[in-house]
């Protein structure tokens, strides 16, 4: 197998793992990185991304395995477990409905570097604005959330259908707006990623099953493992980071990165492809 392709697979796995749970948009980074690296054709690259995304999902499941095991064990008798699962389901549904309705149109028109870069900048400005507002904390732990809180965050997640917006960014910043603590908003975003990303990945994998190629198995394995390990580091690091800091640094990163992409596109320095 081509060593260069394996290195590219590892790079994309690293990009997915690091960016999936940070408020900087994994989809946006993968679109830009995939275009820059010229990795596979567009359809095969899409299948590869689906597989490495599952690695990131597995990482958050592993990190919160005790909590998830307790929830499953408590479904027969613990009302709090049912409340937790119900809140996840309520938050999960809005993106499903809008994704199935508008997913094809969004992919056709917005899945290219320049629209993604624009979304990076807009999202960064929103985070800066959100961090400068006062947010009275009403919910300090995920278990204190009501179904209304879950629905609001689910609606916020719908903005992430626009590539470059960031699913974690939309849900975390939305949670802050709605009165959740940084810890509660971030952890609920992690938990919400499990059904949301799993459903999206399996649905896309089923639609593209004809493209599954045994020749890609090595690339997928490398990308999956790197994605899992880097996502594990990112999840643990973000929880530590937010205990002492806000999200301003991510906002400035988004703005700077978006401006660089737009500048290289407009100057002709980089010929971005879809």
Swiss-Prot record:
It is a multi-pass membrane protein. Signal peptide: none annotated. This is Undecaprenyl-diphosphatase 2. It catalyses: di-trans,octa-cis-undecaprenyl diphosphate + H2O = di-trans,octa-cis-undecaprenyl phosphate + phosphate + H(+). It holds the Pfam family BacA. The chain crosses the membrane at residues 47-64, 82-102, 110-130, 185-205, 219-239, 249-269. The keyword Ubl conjugation does not apply. Keywords: Antibiotic resistance, Cell inner membrane, Cell membrane, Cell shape, Cell wall biogenesis/degradation, Hydrolase, Membrane, Peptidoglycan synthesis, Transmembrane, Transmembrane helix.
């Amino acid at each position: 197998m081509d060593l260069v392709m394996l290195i590219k697979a590892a790079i994309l796995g690293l990009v997915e793992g690091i960016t999936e749970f940070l408020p900087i948009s994994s989809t946006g980074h993968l679109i830009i990185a995939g275009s820059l690296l010229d990795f596979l054709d567009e359809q095969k690259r899409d299948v590869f991304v689906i597989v490495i995304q599952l690695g990131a999902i597995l990482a958050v499941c592993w990190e919160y395995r005790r909590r998830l095991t307790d929830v499953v064990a408590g479904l027969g008798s613990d009302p709090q477990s049912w409340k937790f699962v119900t809140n996840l389901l309520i938050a999960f549904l809005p993106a499903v409905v809008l994704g199935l309705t508008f997913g094809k149109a969004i992919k056709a028109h917005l899945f290219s570097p320049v629209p993604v870069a624009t979304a990076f900048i807009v999202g960064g400005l929103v985070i800066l604005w959100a961090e400068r507002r006062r947010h009275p904390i009403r919910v300090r732990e995920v278990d204190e959330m009501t179904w209304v809180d879950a629905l609001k965050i689910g609606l916020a997640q719908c903005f992430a259908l626009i590539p470059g917006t960031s699913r974690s960014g939309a849900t975390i910043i939305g949670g802050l707006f709605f009165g959740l603590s940084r810890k509660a908003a971030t952890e609920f975003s992690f938990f919400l990623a499990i059904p949301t990303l799993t459903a999206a990945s399996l649905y896309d994998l089923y639609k593209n099953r004809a493209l599954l190629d045994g020749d890609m198995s090595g690339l997928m394995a490398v990308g999956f493992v790197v994605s899992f390990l880097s996502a594990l580091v990112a999840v643990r690091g973000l929880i530590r980071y937010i205990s002492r800091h806000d999200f301003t640094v991510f906002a400035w990163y988004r703005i700077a990165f978006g401006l660089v992409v737009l500048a290289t596109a407009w100057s002709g320095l980089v010929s971005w492809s879809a």
